[in-house]
Amino acid sequence: RALLSESVMPGLSPDLLEQCDGDWRVAVQRLPLIHDTSLPRDPVQPDWQGWLSRRGLRRSDLASGDHVSAPDHAVRAAIAGRGVALVRASLADHAVQEGRLVTLIADGVTGLNWRYYLLNPEGRPLSRAARAIADFLTEEARPFETSGV
C-alpha cells in the first residue's frame, strides 16, 4: 500500500529568514547552504545547483556550507541556524508545525519520483496488531498527501 510521496524544499530557522527580511531569494542566494549528501548519485535527489537553476538563481559558492550524510541531519542543521537546507517534507513537518523551521512552499517544492510503501507478503492477511500499525501509518501519512508538505 502506498503511504506517501516525498518532496524536498528549502528549510531554515525562522531567525535566519528574519535576518533576510523574510525574502527567500535573499536567503537561498546569501546564507550558507546545507548539503544532504546521503544520495549523491541519485538523479532524482535534487541538489542546490539544480534547485537554484530551475528558478533562474545562481550562486558562485555552491559547494560551500555544511555537508551532512543523512536527511534528518540536514533538518537539524537548518533548525540550529547553520543555513538553508533542501529538506524532505516528511522529516521537516514536525519542526514546521512547532515553528522551529520554516519552509518555502510556493514554487519551492521539488517532488521526488519515489514513494514510501507499506509491504506485506502477498496472500498473507495481516494480524490484528499489524493491521493496527498499517492503519496508524496510513493515517499519519494522509496530511502529506493532502497538504503538499
Describe these PLM feature segments.
Residues 57-104, 111, 126:
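Hydrophobic hinge/microswitch elements
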Residues 45-51, 68, 88, 116, ...:
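Tryptophan-centric aromatic hotspots in well-structured domains and transmembrane helices
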Residues 32-55:
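Secondary-structure junction motif
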Residues 90-94, 98, 106-149:
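C-terminal effector-binding regulatory domain of bacterial HTH transcription factors
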Residues 2, 35, 67, 103-105, ...:
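Structural signal for conserved beta-strand scaffold positions within catalytic alpha/beta enzyme cores
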